[in-house]
């Protein structure tokens, strides 16, 4: 498993944000990472993330942290507008990759597209649900003990294109209920309910 280290400065910055968000150290936290620098083809529809957030709050006693990187404000905004769930949108705080490390390490689970933060979760031994569309899972087929890949087998996938030239079915045919099932399975197996 890869290792990541957190400096005192990075941890202090994350602690300040967690205090701002009023996240208690005893609360369970699920991180949602809806973006992908690679391109839109790796992004699960924000409307689906919005529905997933509602389902997670119905099923789990947890707080939801929405991580959004540079250029992902519109994705985060759509999720916030479409969801009835209580979601903490971190986009306005412009969390950089250094501070994202301790933020993800604080999460009890991460639900993400196939993008960099998934590897942070693996490095911190966190359960992670990866919604995978245009990429071949064989490229990252290591350290999957606490990882569930949710994907669709389609003739056009994996295409490895940043933008889908077709109808983006590799992502749009993965439904929130399916991702929820994967998350609930990982939660039961890995997250202490105490």
Segments (PLM) and residue ranges:
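Donor-binding and catalytic core of enzymes assembling or modifying cell-surface/extracellular glycoconjugates
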Residues: 46-133
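A short acidic, often aromatic-flanked loop/helix-cap motif at beta-alpha or helix-coil junctions
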Residues: 5-8, 95-99, 155-158
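Short, solvent-exposed loop/turn segments at secondary-structure boundaries
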Residues: 41-45, 170
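Glycine/Thr-rich phosphate-binding loops of Rossmann-like dinucleotide-binding domains
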Residues: 40-41, 74-75, 120, 138-139
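Nucleotide-sugar donor-binding patch of glycosyltransferase catalytic domains
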Residues: 78-82, 87-91, 122-193
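Mid-sequence helix-capping/hinge segment at a functional interface
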Residues: 1-41, 190
């Amino acid at each position: 498993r890869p290792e990541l280290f957190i400096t005192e400065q990075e941890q202090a910055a994350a602690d300040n944000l967690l205090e701002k968000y009023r996240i208690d150290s005893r609360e369970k936290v699920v991180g949602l990472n809806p973006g992908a620098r690679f391109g839109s083809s790796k992004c699960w529809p924000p409307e689906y993330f919005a529905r997933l957030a509602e389902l997670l709050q119905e099923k789990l006693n947890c707080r939801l942290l929405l991580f959004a990187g540079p250029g992902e404000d519109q994705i985060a905004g759509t999720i916030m507008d479409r969801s009835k769930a209580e979601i903490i949108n971190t986009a306005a705080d412009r969390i950089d990759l250094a501070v994202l490390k301790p933020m993800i390490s604080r999460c009890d689970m991460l639900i993400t597209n196939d993008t960099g933060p998934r590897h942070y979760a693996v490095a911190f031994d966190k359960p992670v649900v990866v919604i995978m569309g245009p990429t071949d899972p064989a490229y990252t087929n290591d350290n999957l003990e606490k990882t569930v890949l949710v994907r669709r087998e389609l003739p056009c996938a994996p295409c490895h294109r940043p933008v889908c030239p077709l109808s983006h079915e590799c992502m749009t045919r993965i439904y929130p209920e399916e991702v929820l099932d994967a998350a609930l399975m990982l939660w039961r197996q890995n997250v202490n309910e105490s």
